[in-house]
Amino acid sequence: MAQEGQNIDEPVVIGEEKGSVRLTTLNRPRQLNVISPEVVFKLAEYLELWEKDDQTKLILIKGTGRAFSAGGDLKVFYHGQESKDSCLEVVYRMYWLCYHIHTYKKTQVSLVNGISMGGGAALMVPMKFSVVTEKTVFATPEASFGFHTDCGFSYIHSRLPGHLGEFLALTGARLNGKELVAIGMATHFVPSGKLMDLEARLVSLDSGDADVVQSTIEEFSEKVNLDKDSILNKQSVINECFSKESVKQIIQAFEAEASKDGNEWITPVIKGLKRSSPTGLKIVLQSIREGRKQTLSDCLKKEFRLTLNILRKTISPDMYEGIRALTIDKDNSPKWNPATLDEVDDEKINSVFKLFEDDDIELQIPETEENRWGGKYETSGYASVRG
């Protein structure tokens, strides 16, 4: 079935061999390069092929149009809700792919000149080199529509300075390219006007040596200076508020800070928090907090369980209601269930974090070199059950 607005003859991911360089282009510009099942499948196919290929030295990834990638294809989730576990395969494949991106054996460079959100940013942040521009916009807005911070971001956000991770995950606050470099979520800032020249230089390198690639990028990169009103200059307030034990306490502390001179920026952030799914907020906070003590593998396995429970409406249908309000009916008036933080049962929140009874249906992370590309969906407990 052709994707909406996509020419049936156009591949959603373009893989090109240019000497020893492999260039991957996300090619759904009308949909802001959102990650469809086919995108996940092709990316995994290319990355495995190229890691095993002795002729491949360097991997580049970019997006067509004004976005790098706006994240997962929410409409696929929404329209699959009436068929049990219809999205299970793509979810499994995506988290399995995230592990391999984080642990990839060859040098990868992401060229991010536009929107990079949610799962789309999972193709940016873990790379050896992530190049951003003045057009780059990053966010993890999942809590706003009843989902959770996934695709490895419970691992990434939990390792940011102070309690910035909780802030980004709960509020969906946006960061620009300079801010991403400042906190280590990107490695280099290059003006967008120089990006094509940088790409051409990287393609001509014939080297995957990290030092050579880094020095080449630095020929084009600029030192970053944060804007005066950058959210990163509010770190002390963020740490004070987002270190609180619960979402309710975080909001209360934030409201107290909002009344102080110079903190006018807080009011719209609070409004956004209060519009978000109460269930989603509680899941997100617990996931980030647990992530601080978990390995990458543990975080991805946990996120897989959370996603399946959310897709199955185990404790709430909020994700589907959030997607409806955001992208289907576009009324921006979701009716959350439960409607308030006080009504959300913490025991139910804990239940969606629990291990599955059968280890065969956990995400299978290949943690030994001998099994480096094992654990695929095809060999999982799900494939045998679903046929």
UniProtKB/Swiss-Prot annotation:
Q: Which InterPro entries match?
A: ClpP/crotonase-like_dom_sf, ECH_dom, HIBYL-CoA-H
Pfam families to which the protein is assigned, alphabetical: ECH_2
- Per the UniProt entry, the Enzyme Commission number(s) are 3.1.2.-
Q: Which NCBIfam families match?
A: PRK05617.1
Recorded superkingdom: Eukaryota
> Which top class of enzyme applies to this chain?
hydrolase
Q: Where are the N-acetylalanine residues found in this chain? A: 2
Query: What family does the database annotate?
Result: Belongs to the enoyl-CoA hydratase/isomerase family.
Q: Which UniProt keywords apply?
A: Acetylation, Hydrolase
Spell out the GO cellular component terms annotated for this protein, sorted alphabetically and separated by semicolons.
cytosol; extracellular region
Q: Which organism is it from?
A: Arabidopsis thaliana (Mouse-ear cress)
> This protein is called what?
3-hydroxyisobutyryl-CoA hydrolase-like protein 5
Q: Which GO terms describe its molecular function?
A: 3-hydroxyisobutyryl-CoA hydrolase activity
